[in-house]
């Protein structure tokens, strides 16, 4: 979408921050809280299945976040088919309401039957998206970097598309650059690069390409110093966005001197 607006528009909500972060994988809730603050994010994802399970790592998570300041993005992580994703999305909407966000219909849609590579199922994602949109959800689908699928999801009413930069948690950065560029160029909804971002330069690269936002979890939560990495990611996103808006110098194969070469004697050149 890459418009020049200072705000990120998703559904009927406007956000100043273009960095979304996840709440999983932190060693402690305190680390998560500090990282959220340093990231300056406004949207945090919550894995509905994990929050409602007995996993000790997620106990107290909902209470540790100030939902008056942050917008909850329930996600369907762990769902392997469309039926399961639809059910978990509805549970996520109720979870958001319980946190005080009565008008929150957001869902990050993940349908991942593949446990090894964690690649999203395009057919299951499309099927679930169609059903959830009919039920009033603001659907934010996680997809492979497939321009045709991205356009199809936009056309059925998804509020954004979230192509992966590379495999989840791989920290490989943007490995699907050409396809993501096509998605950005042809999209009329925000494009949020999700998965694979490992360092701030990866986040900056995504934003320089014209992505509207990035979503990051593992790179922050599993860093040696999560709160410092969160700050770095925040600055990377800002830098990349500014570079995109400024308009970068076009790459070219030959040198182009920054100082004039007029009135320089030919004899002064090194032979």
Curated annotation (Swiss-Prot):
Keyword annotations from UniProtKB, A to Z: Cytoplasm, Schiff base, Thiamine biosynthesis, Transferase
Highest taxon listed in the record's lineage: Bacteria
What EC number(s) are associated with this protein in UniProt?
2.8.1.10
Gene3D superfamilies this protein is in? Aldolase class I
Indicate the residues that form the catalytic site.
Answer: 108
State its location(s).
Answer: Cytoplasm
Q: Name one GO biological process term.
A: thiamine diphosphate biosynthetic process
- Any GO molecular function: thiazole synthase activity
Known catalytic reactions? [ThiS sulfur-carrier protein]-C-terminal-Gly-aminoethanethioate + 2-iminoacetate + 1-deoxy-D-xylulose 5-phosphate = [ThiS sulfur-carrier protein]-C-terminal Gly-Gly + 2-[(2R,5Z)-2-carboxy-4-methylthiazol-5(2H)-ylidene]ethyl phosphate + 2 H2O + H(+)
> Which pathway is this protein engaged in?
Cofactor biosynthesis; thiamine diphosphate biosynthesis
The enzyme's first-digit EC class, named in words, is transferase
Please classify the protein's predominant subcellular localization into one broad category: cytoplasm
Q: Which family does it belong to?
A: Belongs to the ThiG family.
Q: What does this protein do?
A: Catalyzes the rearrangement of 1-deoxy-D-xylulose 5-phosphate (DXP) to produce the thiazole phosphate moiety of thiamine. Sulfur is provided by the thiocarboxylate moiety of the carrier protein ThiS. In vitro, sulfur can be provided by H(2)S.
- Quaternary state and partners of this protein? Homotetramer. Forms heterodimers with either ThiH or ThiS.
What is the name of this protein?
Thiazole synthase
| Naturally occurring in which organism (per UniProt) | Prochlorococcus marinus (strain SARG / CCMP1375 / SS120)
Gene label: thiG
């Amino acid at each position: 979408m890459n418009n020049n607006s200072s705000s990120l528009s998703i559904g009927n909500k406007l956000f100043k921050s273009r960095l979304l972060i996840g709440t999983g994988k932190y060693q402690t809730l305190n680390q998560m809280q500090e990282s959220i603050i340093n990231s300056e994010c406004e949207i945090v994802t919550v894995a509905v299945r994990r929050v409602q399970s007995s996993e000790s790592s997620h106990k107290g998570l909902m209470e540790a976040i100030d939902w008056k300041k942050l917008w909850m993005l329930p996600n369907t992580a762990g769902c392997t088919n469309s039926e399961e994703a639809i059910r978990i999305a509805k549970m996520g909407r109720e979870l958001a309401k319980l946190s005080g966000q009565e008008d929150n219909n957001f869902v990050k849609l993940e349908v991942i039957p593949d446990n090894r590579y964690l690649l999203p199922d395009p057919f299951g994602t499309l099927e679930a998206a169609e059903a959830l949109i009919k039920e009033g959800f603001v659907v934010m689908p996680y997809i492979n970097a497939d321009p045709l699928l991205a356009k199809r999801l936009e056309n059925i009413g998804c509020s954004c598309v979230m192509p992966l930069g590379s495999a989840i948690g791989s920290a490989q950065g943007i490995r699907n650059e050409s396809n993501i560029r096509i998605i950005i160029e042809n999209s009329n909804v925000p494009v949020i690069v999700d998965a694979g971002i490992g360092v701030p330069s990866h986040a900056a690269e995504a934003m320089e390409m014209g992505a509207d936002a990035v979503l990051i979890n593992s790179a922050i939560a599993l860093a040696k110093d999560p709160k410092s990495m969160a700050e770095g990611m925040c600055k990377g996103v800002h830098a990349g966005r500014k570079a995109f808006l400024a308009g970068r110098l076009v790459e070219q194969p030959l040198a182009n001197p920054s100082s004039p070469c007029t009135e320089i004697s030919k004899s002064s050149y090194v032979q």
